[in-house]
From Swiss-Prot:
Keywords: ATP-binding, Ligase, Magnesium, Metal-binding, Nucleotide-binding, Tricarboxylic acid cycle
Upper classification of the organism: Bacteria, Pseudomonadati, Pseudomonadota, Gammaproteobacteria, Alteromonadales
Function summary: Succinyl-CoA synthetase functions in the citric acid cycle (TCA), coupling the hydrolysis of succinyl-CoA to the synthesis of either ATP or GTP and thus represents the only step of substrate-level phosphorylation in the TCA. The beta subunit provides nucleotide specificity of the enzyme and binds the substrate succinate, while the binding sites for coenzyme A and phosphate are found in the alpha subunit.
Cofactor names: Mg(2+)
Residue numbers binding ATP: 46, 53-55, 99, 102, 107
Residues making up the signal peptide according to the UniProt record: none
GO cellular component, one term: cytosol
Protein residues bound to substrate: 264, 321-323
InterPro entries xref list: ATP-grasp (IPR011761), ATP-grasp_succ-CoA_synth-type (IPR013650), ATP_grasp_subdomain_1 (IPR013815), Succ-CoA_synthase_bsu_CS (IPR017866), SUCC_ACL_C (IPR005811), Succ_CoA_ligase-like_bsu (IPR005809), Succinyl-CoA_synth-like (IPR016102)
GO molecular function, one term: succinate-CoA ligase (GDP-forming) activity
Binding residues annotated for Mg(2+), in chain numbering: 199, 213
Name the UniProt record assigns to this protein: Succinate--CoA ligase [ADP-forming] subunit beta
Length: 388
């Protein structure tokens, strides 16, 4: 689950981190009033969506005219913002963040992730602020400095000082940076973050450290113990199909291909997508129906897959371990009849009672294409998607 920038900065403020005075506004009039409340003669207005690249897409504006703030809000509220991180439809703008303007002398980067390799929270800092960290990692990896947080001892001030020295901070900035580092590290574990970015973390013209942006991703598996964070969820930013899938405990991720994939098991699902790619196809989705591939869940999975108009064929790849393949086959048949599937469906069954499951499919009277192996299934579904 992701948070909006204004929500991230509200959390920063709770932990004593330096952020700009700002207000999230629902109407153009609120935006104008927010600028008046903030004071000053320059403001920054930002569309609030769960995507980067807002500035290049026109979703960020610096202005000293309150009527320009009104015009900006009137233009964007209720519309979708399309950036390089969204699909062609973009994401809806329901709030505009109005902030005081900050004079910038230098831009830095500070972020943290849960690193699977070290099984630790890892902080990353760089002098290359305002640039995508992936670009820095690819082109100049030596400019990324890391601090690994030991879960037993927690974050330590010396780790912040070590990063600060590498960033070239002066003694005053070092103290400020240490406070930011310690606050973020505490916040990361307190609220079960999966990702945290301040890009840019700036040094103002007055020489102070300031959090100019904020990006937070929450571990969805921990939301049951984070009621405050859970209430911050903005469902308008979710993909409609992914949100529908979550209601039925289906793991679905929309992609841009034309071969729908329905698989039980995340590893098998990824392998299925790989082999579809290998044989010239493009998966339209990742969909893991989990261990309990019941008729109801399979039916919902078909509905979700077929709600994508780009899907030209569906590959169902099921390994019967705990559940029997003949039961799964009956579920597939019932789901196909209920949903009224009109595109070719290729089914590969393996595991417990696989032969009986294939027999059930063959005797169903439905136009279901049986596959003997995963390779055979991939070849057949790619051909079906191409109309061959």
């Amino acid at each position: 689950m992701n948070l909006h920038e204004y929500q991230a900065k509200a959390l920063f403020a709770e932990y004593g981190l330096p952020v700009s005075e700002g207000y999230a506004c629902d109407t153009p009039q609120e935006a104008v009033e927010a600028a008046g409340h903030i004071g000053g003669d320059m403001w920054v207005v930002k569309c609030q969506v769960h995507a980067g690249g807002r500035g290049k897409a026109g979703g960020v504006k610096v202005t000293g005219d309150k009527e320009e703030i009104r015009a900006f809000a009137e233009h964007w509220l209720g519309k979708n913002l399309v950036t390089y991180q969204t699909d062609e439809k973009g994401q809806p703008v329901a709030k505009i963040l109005v902030e005081s303007c900050t004079d910038i002398a230098n831009e830095l980067y500070l972020g943290a992730v849960v690193d699977r390799a070290t099984r630790r929270v890892v902080f990353m800092a760089s002098t290359e602020g305002g640039v995508e960290i992936e670009t820095v990692a690819e082109e100049t990896p030596e400019l990324i400095h890391k601090a690994i947080i030991d879960p037993l001892t927690g974050p330590q001030p010396y780790q912040a000082r070590d990063l600060g020295f590498k960033l070239g901070l002066n003694p005053t900035q070092m103290k400020q940076f240490t406070k930011v580092f310690m606050g973020l590290a505490t916040m990361f574990t307190d609220h079960d973050f999966a990702l945290l970015e301040i890009n840019p973390l700036v040094i103002t013209t007055e020489g102070n450290i300031h959090c100019l942006d904020g990006k937070i991703g929450i571990d969805g598996n921990a939301l049951f113990r984070q009621p405050k964070i859970r209430d911050m969820h903005d469902p308008s930013q979710d993909d409609a199909r992914e949100a529908h899938a979550a209601k039925f405990e289906l793991n679905y991720v929309a992609l841009d291909g034309n071969v729908g994939c329905m698989v039980n098991g995340a590893g098998l699902a990824m392998g299925t997508m790989d082999i579809v790619n290998l044989h010239g196809g493009k998966p339209a989705n990742f969909l893991d129906v989990g261990g309990g591939a019941t008729k109801e869940r399979v039916a919902e999975a078909f509905k979700i897959i077929l709600s994508d108009a780009n899907v030209k064929a569906v590959l169902v790849n099921i390994f019967g371990g705990i559940v029997r393949c003949d039961m799964i086959a009956e579920g597939i048949i019932g789901a196909v009849k209920e949903v009224g599937v009109e595109v070719p469906v290729v089914v590969r069954l393996e595991g417990t009672n696989a032969d009986l499951g294939r027999e059930v499919l063959a005797n169903s009277g439905l136009d279901i294409i049986a596959a003997e192996s995963l390779t055979d299934a991939a070849v057949k579904v790619v051909a079906a998607a191409e109309g061959k």
